[in-house]
Amino acid sequence: MVPFNSAVFDPDNQFHISSALLNRKEIIKTLKNSFSPPAFPLDIMENNLNFNIMNFDTFKAAAIDFFTIEKISLCHPGGSSGYKISSNKKSIVYALDHEFGLDKDIDNSLLKIASNSDVVIWDGMYTMQEIKDKKGWGHSSIEDGVIFHKKSKAKKLFISHHAPERSDKDLDSMSKTMLPKSLR
């Protein structure tokens, strides 16, 4: 969360903010609505000169000397985008807010973009048992992540976006029972 990162308030820091889902004006509006009174105690957008907010294509072009970034549409109510970031022959795929199995074309495109990547960050909000009652909610299961990891031949799988009610103890236990030893 942007305002809970103390580095945001240091004027010597510069932040580049972009989204494949929203244009520059929409990003500014979203940040202003989320992080100003009454939802947040102060308006972080007011006089915040260390935010460089740009459209995705502008960001992609500006970053080319450091890394390449590709976007992919994901399955989530209201829309969602995933990303593949590559640099120095290494790549990471970020695929949160995605409901695996809802749209085979999107799943196949995601599999293609993640193929042989170094890391896949996966939406593991639910278990296969829990997800049965949550069709259309825009999230995946931990088990789907393991299956996707095998198919993509990615080197590592990071499960993220866990159900908020899970404790660290729950996650440790789930890791031991649901993930192959090679992924722990």
Name each model-derived stretch:
Residues 75, 96, 160:
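Single, functionally critical "micro-switch" positions that shape active/binding sites
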